[in-house]
Amino acid sequence: NIFSPLWCKVETFNQSLQLSDQDPYDYAKAERLFPESKKVKVEFAFTAGQQDHGTLEIELTDGKGMPCLRIMLDSTGSILTKQGYRNKSLGKYKANEKMIVTIELNAASRFYTVSLNGSKPANNICFAPVASVERIVFRTGRIRHFPDAETPTDQSYDLFNTEVPVKNARYSIHYLKTKTLP
């Protein structure tokens, strides 16, 4: 499943899935389903076309789309994971360098490990409990929580510079493997 607005494309390019984003307010998204698992190993390879702008968020979610873990590539070349209200650094990425990410998740214990390019796995705890996971999401921006129930009915402002594209950020997903663990 993909979400691909005009300035946020999801397309195949050089045998990879490429997400590009030059929209100041929207994002590109690709979502892949896999067999429901309480314990799972997920491996994927990506290349970021830049390390000085753009954002890529990767989430494992349950069947209703509730995420339990999030890995982020930020605009400073850092790879982070969400740890409660804070973010924890996992390492750095470089523009145009392929990286392999391996995640092993145990939904029952809420613990997961992340390994970058075969490095020693870093232990982490999920920021939200889920019974199982069955989707991985790649998104070029933050999830939207606006408008919500508290948003005024009549809006008296417009978003600033919606007609001006920002510097294009590109991310290529080379492959994705999932495996249910015993």
Segments (PLM) and residue ranges:
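Short structured motifs
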Residues: D26-E31, G84-S89, L159-N161
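Short strand-turn-strand beta-turns centered on an Asx-Gly dipeptide
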Residues: S115-S119
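Flexible glycan-contacting loops in extracellular carbohydrate-active proteins
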Residues: N124-H174
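Short, tryptophan-glycine- and acidic/Ser/Thr-enriched carbohydrate-recognition patches
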Residues: N1-S4
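Short tryptophan-centered beta-strand motifs in secreted/extracellular beta-sheet-rich domains
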Residues: F44, N96-A107, Y112-V114
